[in-house]
A protein has these predicted regions:
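Short amphipathic alpha-helix that is part of the acyltransferase structural core
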Residues: 1-13, 49, 53-54, 117-162
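N-terminal charged segments
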Residues: 1-76, 87-89, 168
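Conserved beta-hairpin
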Residues: 24-29, 85, 91-102, 174-188
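Acyl-donor-binding surface of acyltransferase catalytic domains
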Residues: 58-136, 264-266
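Conserved acetyl-CoA-binding loop-helix of GNAT-fold acetyltransferases
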Residues: 59-67, 203-208, 212-229, 248-252
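Conserved GNAT acetyl-CoA-binding A-motif
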Residues: 73-85, 227-241
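Conserved active-site alpha-helix within GNAT-family acetyltransferase domains
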Residues: 87-103, 213, 217, 242-260
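A conserved beta-strand-loop-helix scaffold within acyl/acetyltransferase catalytic domains
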Residues: 150, 157-205
Length: 272
């Protein structure tokens, strides 16, 4: 019988919602190959997922496997590796860090019910987005929230491809994209997508000019209520940077830490 790799972590299990829609997942038994041919610039749409953290000989092995499995298929300029642990085990990451890889440490939070955040914004109108102009504003908001380590031109290409995937998924009934508006100006947005009654949040972003007003917490709360009531979920999942304040906002709404997720990625920063 052919060996299969079973993914145990809630974070990575829900990450696979997206390549299952329009990408490819190749199960090699001892690792998974995740591909998004429509968006090769999407680092975490084109990565390898291993069952365990890197061991002492895995630096060279993992790079070789990435080149064979992903680099040979797509025109990529990055490497990305995840491992299916739930307690944040690092393993032998030093050789990767010495070669310029980034270590990503995230907390996976979940909840079955939410509560009104302590800083609730009553000025914003929150609703699912459907119109072309709303989607374009969402794209522009996502680009405005670009991390500074990425070039604007490259990030625009990546983000437009990513948002087109999300739009197609909403059209297929697999989730919802929600915006927070002040009059007709979108100031924050996010997505929630469904698998097996689990709703996974994506790309929670508030425009830099509208932060610290309670908009993020209000948006997540209202989107959570919508997902629990209208799109058939009973569990909500959020993945956040362990060292970023957003996790505290989510906890104020009722999310609780469940797992710790670790990954590594690399790209040529001389091109930024």
């Amino acid at each position: 019988m052919e060996r299969k790799m079973e993914v145990h972590s809630l974070g990575y299990r829900t990450d696979l919602i997206f390549p299952k829609f329009d990408g490819e997942i190749i199960d090699r038994g001892v690792y998974l190959v995740i591909l998004t041919p429509s968006n090769p610039t999407f680092y975490w749409g084109n990565f390898l997922l291993f069952p365990n953290p890197p061991g002492k000989d895995d630096f060279g092995n993992w790079k070789r496997v990435f080149a064979e499995e992903i680099g040979s298929r797509l025109n990529v300029e990055h490497m990305a590796f995840g491992w299916d642990s739930v307690e944040g085990q690092l393993g032998e990451v030093k050789p990767f860090l010495d070669e310029g890889f980034n270590l990503n440490q995230s907390v996976v939070l979940d909840t079955h019910q939410v509560k009104i955040p302590p800083k609730y914004n009553r000025e914003v109108m929150i609703r699912p987005i459907t119109e072309d102009w709303e989607w374009e504003q969402a794209i522009q908001n996502q680009i405005a929230c670009r991390p500074p380590e990425f070039s604007l031109q490259g990030y625009q290409v990546f983000k437009r491809g990513q948002m087109e995937r999300y739009r197609q998924m909403t059209r297929a009934g697999l989730g919802v994209w929600v915006g927070a508006f002040l009059e007709k100006q979108l100031v924050a947005d996010l997505g929630v997508f469904v698998t097996d009654k689990i709703g996974r949040f994506q790309q929670v972003e508030t425009h830099p000019e509208y932060r610290r007003r309670g908009i993020c917490g209000t948006l997540v709360y209202r989107a959570s209520c919508y997902a629990l009531e209208h799109i058939g979920v009973n569990t909500l999942v959020m993945v956040a940077d362990e060292n970023y304040h957003a996790a505290k906002i989510y906890e104020s709404i009722g999310f609780k830490p469940k797992e710790h997720q670790v990954s590594l990625d690399w790209w040529d920063k001389s091109k930024v």
